[in-house]
């Protein structure tokens, strides 16, 4: 018991931080070459040395043990620590030495050969060998007390093995080992650990790596067939990524490397030039400063070299952390949530293809021998458990090589195999727990095992436990050990605690079938050792998907976000960054060769457009200097140089071994423009850093902006107000824009610098070139709305336009052949749009009201083409009172086509807008968000829909394009008035707007525009044309769209465009202007009737059918207590709506209010725990019970825990479940013995799955589950409807009209008042 206890203690003290270890002195005896075992230190001492493959590591015994012979034994059992009883205490040097207040260790009593060893508060005398004295400074025995040798960093002295071997893997030793010195020197190791931290380092992608410990180097080897992966710090079958990787340098000064010179320092001064040179290396750093008065000051300092500037080290393929060298120091960086670090691009990206989950098929394919198939041979096998087979692996030999003939499996030299037994006495005892203390990828805490990396997931790692199992049986979580126990005929098993080594989510849940071979091998075939590590390894049953390319799996499903990114990057053929605004944390990287990523900056950094990289000081005015672009060093990947063209600066990105450097302009102003008043202040103001240098602490505004500066002890931090709020420096708070003095007089200025494409072509934000826009570069949609107020803005001469609402942009399109006119804020004919007239007349490549005109530079032959944008002010044409988007729309939710954007209108005003979740779009037929595959095709064809549910087909109305298919109008102004002429077919036309006039016509206010054309030479032809083109009846009206204000009325002069008055829309069904709340109702009913007559009835009833049938007009109702959803009724139509975040609907106020103000939303943090036992019964219940969870005999759902003889109560299971103490989980009552009747009620269940109403409580009902009743409860405010077997409103169940318990769910009063509706 004593040796085993000492062994376990030694293991804990060696591998954990609370162990006491002393660095071995150079005078201590080193380990012989390739020797494995223990070497004792001083007499009666806890310190000793462990030799692993000739490498020495210091170790200590536990507090109450000392090292004697070959093991740690108690102090009392060590002969070296015994005290002579005949010795008088007064004469002993340690009699007066007090160890009670000292830590365990060795203490000197003077320059003598005796010293004191304090163990557990007791003093024990120990002696050095003859002619040696104890040296207090070195803590060992030496020839003199003043002898102190200097440490060296050379490899330790190695002794040659003796004549006698150390035995085989069984641990048996032929004889005692005697160390014999040898004059032969080992091979020198060509690796220097000076200045490196303790750890493992690789010298290329091979099987050799080096371990540094205390500036000492140790050469190590990986198993055959594997190489050392520096990123994973373990031996693997291949190297994933070349390391190190360099990325964009964060240096703020020009870095140069001086030539090595005989002189240690060099200084240069100049009276005319002010220069500063920084050299991050061990050599001298020279700084020269020259004043204006020709006074020269030279300061020379020396800074140690820590790392190469910009060097990046990753932590593996699918890791979110990485290290980056910045300012000659290594800094740890963390990627944001849902992003991983991609080493090849040196950035944090979303949707990394290499780390996407793989779908495992239901029936995995099995492979044994034969040609390659679609099943990948992978070392990370998750379903295989190897069957034990005697002598199927080759043995390892640690002694001298055998020169005789070898039959069967030959011996292999394994430098990382640790023998189970060591030399010396007590060889018949098994002792675990000794392992190498040096950090090694193959180190293990269990002696006598083959040390494998955690990445080999074939269940070979064992823990100590009771030996049990059968030689040929694989059952449960047992697995065999790879060690010398296979020397005998029976393989042994140990219980595994695999969940501590490999979490459950890293393993497949699939169970092996009854006829499947657990290891996937054919036992009748010969087994080769290379099958485990070599290329001839047979394929197993686990499926890993199709082969992976360099950048990811081809078969993995591309997410909707990645698909949108690929679409945005289609037009770019050179590396380009797409930003979402200035100092935003996310951006898009387009490589130009198909590798596109949605990326994000590390935590604490934002993307700086001026630097085209992530920065911690985005927005700080500073001088831009040389930027180093990351390189990719690869043996099999080489491509010509490519160029990143952004903001007028060309950056050369080379994919070869040599990095390139691009010199940016010398001033920050060349990258910046005058920002608009909404977001970012003008750069003419003081920089952020200078602002805080004047005022050490406080909050300062940046003009009329949502961002502001927080100065703290001279350091500047850029912060941002909440949504739609601006910072007011006078009140030191974020408030509305109209309350900020700085926003009162500022006007619109130019837009910021944007990312321009590589080719001189115009393109919109979505990456699709526009056919109707001149060749120029435009501002992206997102940036356009970030710097202007809400409203509608054109995209040049185009049918598409932008709708800005609270800095959110949505792209819309005019109907038919109409183009958007920003001046009138409406869709008109092409010849009536000012931008289109300018585009037709202008022959240059510039168009007014656009942001930039692209002018190609004239580079030399050796330089790439650079596009320098000329800054032009952006002046949006915004009317004083812009027309709201919802002016001509009915109340409710609206969307365009199958986009994910939707907005809510109420009384002709825009209430709110939003976007569906990723991968979903707005479906007008259900008035909600659905996946794109579930949206019907008809809904995608509609440009504008109503708020009523059930609209799944187009309305029967004529469009303007159908009315004017063969007639196009033009107007010429004569002396006395307009002259009506007509031109047929596709004759080119021009228009001149005639004067508008209003005619009172009942409820309509008419805005008339005549459609005329020029005169022809022949009056006969004109009359024929009039008779041919006149197809309308005088007095008839034609709708232009569905429920819009504009319509056409036929007159003698032709079709005249008219407008309904504000608040009314033209109804195509009644052919007149009606209130907007009732527009299209009859047409919708007719369409639904036609649809019902031609299509079968839906299988399921509408969710809110009949709930608004009793409501006349409009009303809102709550659907539950503390619910963020509520029901809006509008003329019998119901619609479920959602409050904004952190708000719930109040039935008293009939509006959404803050959740904290509702008392019903206050929920206790900890659920109440049933108290079944008093303090007197606690000891009685846990008497004789082991620690664990138990079921309460009084309540099957209660959970009790016994720990240390004390009773603890836990929250109970649900009322319908019972606690199963065998599984430790809540289970069905019929599976728990003694709880079969728990949760059941009286009554009979004739049919499984049927529902039974409760006779006494309308809110309670029962569900039949295999002959038993399960109690269920309806939500608050609803009762059970036995006719429909659903929870329904109380009004729908006559027998339960007044039994709803929730008073807040009453209908309340209607908010509709017809008298005050304004129609």
Swiss-Prot record:
Residues 1297-1312 have a biased composition (Low complexity). The keyword rRNA-binding does not apply. It is found in: Secreted, Extracellular space, Extracellular matrix. SUPFAM superfamilies: Invertebrate chitin-binding proteins. GO terms for cellular component: cell periphery; extracellular region. Disruption phenotype: RNAi-mediated knockdown causes the zygote to exit the spermatheca with a pinched morphology and to leave a trailing section behind. Zygotes have a fragmented chitin eggshell with an accumulation of chitin at one end of the embryo, causing polyspermy. In unfertilized oocytes, disrupts the homogenous distribution of cortical chitin synthase chs-1, pseudophosphatase egg-3 and kinase mbk-2 and causes the loss of egg-1 and egg-2 cell membrane localization resulting in their premature accumulation in cytoplasmic puncta. Disulfide bonds join 61-72, 128-141, 222-235, 335-348, 601-614, 721-734, 814-827, 916-929, 1060-1073, 1139-1152, 1213-1226, 1274-1287. This is Chitin-binding domain protein cbd-1.
